[in-house]
Amino acid sequence: MKKIVIVISILLTSFLSSAVSAATDSQLLKEKLAKFSFINAEFSQQVSSPEGKILDDSQGMLAISRPGKFRWEVLMPEEELIVSDGQTMWMYSPFIEQVTLLNLSDAIQGTPFILLSGANESQWADYQVNKVNDQFIVKNIAGTVQDRSFIFEFNKSSQVSKFVVIEALGQRSEFKLSHKVLSKPWVEGFFDFSIPAGVEIDDQR
């Protein structure tokens, strides 16, 4: 009986230590992300299969103004634009001449942008964070089969230098950021989108 009590005590101590560590790691990531009010960077994206085969490469520009505003512009190999004003998100494809409108809160659910663009306390509560070496590994506490996990890395200036999205089935999207000094404020309307004439509109709000 005494041995059983000892084993249970060890297990409980281990569990509580893990829970405290996860809470501390979550707070540390939150503080790191809260240090910046904006991001202005070039990005490169590489998508790979679960087996490691490269499926896609792209490059572009990323601008984030916390909370909730961002502009994601793919320049190569095919132009695409995603813009959020904090309420609405526009996804525009010049190639097919179509723009899709979404509620921001729905659109970024389950993506790194929910944390990058300024998550609130209730949104942070949905995620478990574990720091492993220089990486912050983020997983949804609910743990459904559709859930993605994220990895964040920071440079010596405490800027986000890389984030990774790992799909439930193992597909991996890796984004590397090269930060640029913002020499002047973004022009008014930078985080708005004016729909071009003749473009097909898919409003899903």
Swiss-Prot record:
GO terms for biological process: lipoprotein localization to outer membrane; lipoprotein transport. Disulfide bonds: none annotated. Residues 1-22 form the signal peptide. Gene3D superfamilies: Lipoprotein localisation LolA/LolB/LppX (2.50.20.10). GO terms for cellular component: outer membrane-bounded periplasmic space. It comes from the Bacteria. Keywords: Chaperone, Periplasm, Protein transport, Signal, Transport. Coiled coil: none annotated. It holds the Pfam family LolA. InterPro entries: LolA/LolB/LppX, OM_lipoprot_carrier_LolA-like, OM_lipoprot_carrier_LolA_Pbac. It is found in: Periplasm. NCBIfam families: lolA (TIGR00547). Participates in the translocation of lipoproteins from the inner membrane to the outer membrane. Only forms a complex with a lipoprotein if the residue after the N-terminal Cys is not an aspartate (The Asp acts as a targeting signal to indicate that the lipoprotein should stay in the inner membrane). Monomer. Belongs to the LolA family. This is Outer-membrane lipoprotein carrier protein. It comes from Psychromonas ingrahamii (strain DSM 17664 / CCUG 51855 / 37).
